[in-house]
Design a protein with these regions (language model features):
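Short, well-structured N-terminal submotif of metal-dependent ribonuclease cores
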Residues: 1-50, 64-76, 80, 118, ...
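Active-site neighborhoods of divalent-metal-dependent phosphate/nucleic-acid chemistry enzymes
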Residues: 11, 66, 71, 80-125
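Basic, glycine-rich
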Residues: 134-138
Length: 139
C-alpha cells in the first residue's frame, strides 16, 4: 500500500524510494524512464528517497568499472532531484532473513527489504521486484 500523508503544500504527498537504476536513468538517460515514473519524479508534492545502499552500490560498481558515475555525479543527481537519503538500519537488515530468494543481487535485496519495512513504493525498471509480495512498484 502506498504510504500517503498530507502535503504541507496541500493535497496528498507520496513517498517514493528510487532504486539505483531509476536514479541512474533519471540522471543519464531520462528517455529510459517510463511515463509513469517520469510523472511521479516530476511531481513536486512527492518525496523522493534513495537508499544509502544505492550510494554503496554506485561507489562499488564505479570502482569496478561497471558504472561511469563519480561521487560528484551522484551527489549532483541527489541534489538536483531533491532526493532524501534514507538511512539503512538494522531493522532493514533483519528483514532480509524473511525475504524469499527471488533475486540474488545483494544491493537490490537490501533496497527491497527497506521499501517493505518502510511501507513505501519503489521506482524500478527491474521486473524481479514484482515477485516480492507486498512491494508496491511504480514504473
Amino acid at each position: 500500500m502506498t504510504k500517503l500523508r498530507p502535503s504541507s503544500r496541500g493535497g496528498i504527498e507520496v513517498r517514493l524510494l528510487l532504486d539505483t537504476a531509476a536514479l541512474i536513468f533519471a540522471v543519464e538517460s531520462p528517455e529510459n524512464l517510463s511515463t509513469r515514473a517520469k510523472a511521479v519524479l516530476q511531481n513536486p508534492q512527492n518525496t523522493l528517497e534513495l537508499s544509502a545502499i544505492s550510494l554503496v552500490e554506485i561507489a562499488i560498481k564505479s570502482a569496478l568499472g561497471k558504472l561511469r558515475l563519480s561521487a560528484e555525479d551522484a551527489r549532483r543527481a541527489v541534489d538536483e532531484l531533491g532526493v532524501r537519503i534514507l538511512p539503512y538500519t538494522s531493522k532493514h537488515a533483519f528483514h532480509l532473513f524473511e525475504l524469499p530468494l527471488h533475486h540474488r543481487d545483494p544491493f537490490d535485496r537490501q533496497i527491497i527489504a527497506q521499501a517493505l519495512v518502510e511501507k513505501i513504493p519503489i521506482a524500478t525498471p527491474d521486473d524481479k521486484f514484482s515477485l516480492y509480495k507486498g512491494l508496491k512498484i511504480i514504473w
